[in-house]
């Protein structure tokens, strides 16, 4: 089937070209194997004499011929040889180095001499060294402090404030050991010491309250009264 153009309408020519390109692609013909001319005909780009064919069916029949197939083999053979010669310099250098490899006998001799010159065995990362138990380090004894520093430290320790309960007990003991007291005063003093030792604290208003830092066994809110004779 042929498509002949009538007139000089460029729009019709473009439509015709699109249709021919579509037909060419529909026939699975590579673009570099066929050329479409301006008059709508096809030229074979593989054959050396460039045959011009009117229709796509004629081009398909030409591509099935023996001459075209032989030309196709030559065409792709030249392409393959061209690709082989277009190697980069790095690949060429690698090929040269591979061609200049040493003889296996020389390589084996060099390896034997290197192994003979090695005195220490090769290190293997898989082997672990056995740790020997180290001797305990000698304990360094601190030098004795001078006598003056010892005296200063003992003086500072003696100056530390004593707990409140101990100071109160000492004061009460000093009061008891001092001048003789009447039985009433002694009973009041003993009651005071009993309350202080039980966790009661005077609030400064003549009352006794529980110390927050002391735990009581009972829930009494008032301290025990002064015992009678």
From Swiss-Prot:
Keyword Glycoprotein found: no
Any one Gene Ontology cellular component term annotated for this protein: nuclear speck
Keywords from the named record: Isopeptide bond, Metal-binding, mRNA processing, mRNA splicing, Nucleus, Phosphoprotein, Spliceosome, Ubl conjugation, Zinc, Zinc-finger
Name this polypeptide is given: Sodium channel modifier 1
Disease as annotated in the protein's UniProt record: Allele R187X is a disease susceptibility variant, which modifies the severity of the disease jolting mutant (medjo) caused by defects in Scn8a. It reduces the abundance of correctly spliced Scn8a transcripts below the threshold for survival thereby converting a chronic movement disorder into a lethal neurological disease.
Entries under Pfam families matching the protein: SCNM1_acidic, zf-SCNM1
Composition-biased stretches (Basic and acidic residues): 157-171
Motif Bipartite nuclear localization signal, residue numbers: 4-20
Subunit details: Component of the minor spliceosome. Within this complex, interacts with RNF113A, as well as with SF3B1/SF3b155, SF3B2/SF3b145, SF3B3/SF3b130 and CDC5L. May interact with LUC7L2 and SNRNP70.
GO molecular function, one term: enzyme binding
Domain of life: Eukaryota
Subcellular location(s) of the protein: Nucleus, Nucleoplasm; Nucleus speckle
Region Disordered: start-end pairs: 80-105, 128-187
Zinc fingers (Matrin-type), renumbered ranges: 42-74
Signal peptide positions (record): none
Gene Ontology terms describing biological process: alternative mRNA splicing, via spliceosome; RNA splicing
Compositional bias segments (type: Polar residues): 82-92
Biological function: As a component of the minor spliceosome, involved in the splicing of U12-type introns in pre-mRNAs. Plays a role in the regulation of primary cilia length and Hedgehog signaling.
Residues recorded with modification Phosphoserine: 2, 182, 218
Required for interaction with LUC7L2: region residues: 187-229
Cross-link (Glycyl lysine isopeptide (Lys-Gly) (interchain with G-Cter in SUMO2)) at residue(s): 67
